[in-house]
Amino acid sequence: MKKINAIILLSSLTSASVFAGAYVENREAYNLASDQGEVMLRVGYNFDMGAGIMLTNTYNFQREDELKHGYNEIEGWYPLFKPTDKLTIQPGGLINDKSIGSGGAVYLDVNYKFVPWFNLTVRNRYNHNNYSSTDLSGELDNNDTYEIGTYWNFKITDKFSYTFEPHYFMRVNDFNSSNGKDHHWEITNTFRYRINEHWLPYFELRWLDRNVEPYHREQNQIRIGTKYFF
């Protein structure tokens, strides 16, 4: 398939350098507060005009524990409106399924390419659970969140790129996050190195706010993964 240059708009919208065509991805994560790990397997396809779709499957594990299924997810996006060669508006959505129930999300990305080596995406997203949970008042309700995220994408060299990714979550109903508040932050630093047209390994350092129950620690997470483009 045709290779897409890393500095064009498609890379900014997905916050990673991509090629048109199919790819597979494997990622492992470890949370220092919960001592829990995650293995992710993903397949995806990027279209020439900027749309994309991906299927994700995850498994969780802890020390001396067996591997347990996390969730299945399908996500897609489409560049709906591009008023200039620098500005793109792109909606997207996903559905997921796990042992406790199903859910989904819809989002709208607005990306602006300031210079060839820097672009910014602002994302507004609503996350919905189809199942009910017990809220702070003892009632059953949907533990939904409204999320605002930004992706600060820097192209350092032809092979090396960096993304700063802060996300702010607000509970829609009467629930608290793991920090004991009705809101929390998740901040990700992603470092990518393109070996060649096929291999793209990456390394992520994440802060997932403080956990007050049961770990009483800052939630720091490490992720290591790689993508292979066909």
Curated annotation (Swiss-Prot):
GO terms for cellular component: cell outer membrane; pore complex. One of its GO terms (molecular function) is porin activity. One of its GO terms (biological process) is D-glucose import. Coiled coil: none annotated. Pfam families: KdgM. Belongs to the oligogalacturonate-specific porin KdgM (TC 1.B.35) family. OmpL subfamily. Outer membrane channel protein that allows an efficient diffusion of low-molecular-weight solutes such as small sugars and tetraglycine. However, the specific substrate recognized by the OmpL channel is unknown. This is Porin OmpL. It comes from Escherichia coli (strain K12). The lineage of its organism: Bacteria, Pseudomonadati, Pseudomonadota, Gammaproteobacteria, Enterobacterales.
